[in-house]
């Protein structure tokens, strides 16, 4: 069977690999960008230009480790440990009342998982101390880029294991390195990549579909898999999943802005990203990138104030809130566009 996969991010390429292993399918992968990577994609250039830095968990990512082994990719070549100290930071802010609330939540979630998949962490966790509330409500931003009134209690309990029991890593050099290696191995397996190809509409029949790309080309055979972010998926899935599509996948969609600080010498942050997120008005999550001279400052909680702040003012406010040494340059990562003084695109992602 011919299988069309729209989206060449890690998800789309992982699906393609599993399908190609069967040796029963022709796999074609499409992406609107110039190369593979999805939200991990980075443009060419001397400076890092990323949508957002990524935190991954070594012991928890068993499927990724297995996939890398099959592809001949070394985990340690792709990722390097980060000094985030998130777990010790959490412990500093919790008291016995908070431990009791977390323990109760874990028992309730694990004994009735389906129920708590539809209840937010904020509604399920119960009473917390002021410091515990600040830590837990901010931790969800570090875990998955969403606030605690969006993350489900089930997702929090399962994800908390990753944070507490697994060493944290970020991209070594850049996410482009991983994307290029995965693409190379897929091509060896027979995958066909088509870039600068944006799917803009899907028409659904009873047992058929027509996918329409921006250049007017169409696909209508075999199977269509959309490995794309939820924000884009909502417009393409339409009512094919029922009338409540917005309710099903809308809440797990988030955007982010990444402000990049460039230095001419190595920089060290005095606090963890969790502490900065707890203490700054914009809940900024800063991490020093692998070159040790670039700080990636991600903002996921996009309030109306942030959305209506012009780029130059936003850069100034982020610098002032972090209280770090003055950088040589302050840039905004790809995926953000402003129109009439308001952010109109912030690189929509999925938290699932």
Question: Residues of each region from the PLM?
Answer:
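N-terminal glycine-rich dinucleotide-binding loop that anchors FAD/FMN and/or NAD(P) in oxidoreductases
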Residues: 42-66
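Conserved Rossmann-like nucleotide-cofactor binding loop
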Residues: 11, 35, 231
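Mobile amphipathic helical/loop "lid" adjacent to a hydrophobic cofactor/ligand pocket
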Residues: 58-153, 164
């Amino acid at each position: 069977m011919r299988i069309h996969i729209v989206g060449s991010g890690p998800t789309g390429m992982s699906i393609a690999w599993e399908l190609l292993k069967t040796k029963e399918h022709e796999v074609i992968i499409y992406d609107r960008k110039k190369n593979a990577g999805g939200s991990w994609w980075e443009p060419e250039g001397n400076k890092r230009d990323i949508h957002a830095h990524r935190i991954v968990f070594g012991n928890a990512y068993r499927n990724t480790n297995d996939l890398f082994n099959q592809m001949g990719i070394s985990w340690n070549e792709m990722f390097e440990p980060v000094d985030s100290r998130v777990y010790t930071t959490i412990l500093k802010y919790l008291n016995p009342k908070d431990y009791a609330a977390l323990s109760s939540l874990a028992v309730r979630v694990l004994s009735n998982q389906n129920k708590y998949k539809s209840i937010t962490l904020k509604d399920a966790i119960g009473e917390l101390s002021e410091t515990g509330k600040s830590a837990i409500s901010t931790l969800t931003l570090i875990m998955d880029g969403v606030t605690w009134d969006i993350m489900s209690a089930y997702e929090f309990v399962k994800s908390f294991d990753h944070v507490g029991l697994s060493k944290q890593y970020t991209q070594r050099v850049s996410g482009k390195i991983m994307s290029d290696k995965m693409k190379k191995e897929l091509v060896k397996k027979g995958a066909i990549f088509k870039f600068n190809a944006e799917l803009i509409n899907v028409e659904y029949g009873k047992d058929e579909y027509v996918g329409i790309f921006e250049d007017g080309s169409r696909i209508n055979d075999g199977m269509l898999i959309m490995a794309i972010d939820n924000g884009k998926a909502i417009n393409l899935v339409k009512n094919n999943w029922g009338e409540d599509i917005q309710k099903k996948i809308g809440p797990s969609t988030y955007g982010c802005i990444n402000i990049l600080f460039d230095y001419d010498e190595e920089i060290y942050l005095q606090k963890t990203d969790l502490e900065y997120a707890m203490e700054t008005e914009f809940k900024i999550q800063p991490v020093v990138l692998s070159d040790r001279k670039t700080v990636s400052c991600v903002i996921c909680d996009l309030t109306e104030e942030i959305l209506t702040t012009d780029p130059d003012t936003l850069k100034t406010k982020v610098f002032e809130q972090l209280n770090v040494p003055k950088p040589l340059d302050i840039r905004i990562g790809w995926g953000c566009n402003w129109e009439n003084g308001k952010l109109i695109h912030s690189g929509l992602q999925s938290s699932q």
